[in-house]
Structure formats: structure tokens, C-alpha cells
């Protein structure tokens, strides 16, 4: 709720609860963002796939395990998925030079399921 208020996102509805259970109770969405799904991604995607129309799904993944799981599951539900890697770096001075230190790249998967 804090980010919704902070960014005045009046067109955003927040649903609280366990994602795998909550998604099944929602009205059919246009788009779904999945991040930090833990061990429930398979169940979440299965629920989304049961909706009658195709839904745009965006999944963020940081760990190797989540990247592998997402790749496998999207291969099943949407073989033509897209993936990009986003990395942010912060400049740091070393002597008279500056280098970019990067942290945890994020893989962003997009698919219609």
C-alpha cells in the first residue's frame, strides 16, 4: 500500500494474501507481475493459464534457481517468451580511475500465458 500511495497509483489494486491462493480468486487480469514467488510459481502460472484469454505475465528472477525454474515453466506455458537482464552499477573511484560496481543482475521474463 505504501508504494501505491507514494506514487499516487490510483489505477492499481492491491490484493493481500498467499499469491497461489489469491490469484485464483481474482477477476481475470490483463497483466500479472510475479516477483519473490518462492516455491509457488508453478501453481501461480497454472492458475493464470486456466483463464480463458491470454494474459501478459512479467516475472523477475534474481537467483539461479528461480531463473532455471522460470525458464522451464515458461517453456511449458509460453515457449516464445522473452527475457532481458537488467544490471545497475554504481561508480567507484580507484586511484585516478572510476569503475562500475554492479550488484545482483535481475532477469525479467515476459510472456503471454
Predicted regions and their residues:
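C-terminal edge-of-domain segments
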Residues: 106-112
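Short, surface-exposed connector motifs at secondary-structure boundaries
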Residues: 8, 25-30, 47-56
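C-terminal substrate-binding/active-site "lid" region of AdoMet-derived donor-dependent transferases
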Residues: 45-105
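Short, well-ordered alpha-helical microsegments
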Residues: 23, 41-42, 67-68
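S-adenosyl-L-methionine
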Residues: 1-29
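Structural motif
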Residues: 12-13, 30-32, 56-57, 81-82
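A short SAM/SAH-binding and catalytic strip from SAM-dependent methyltransferases
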Residues: 20, 30-42, 60-61
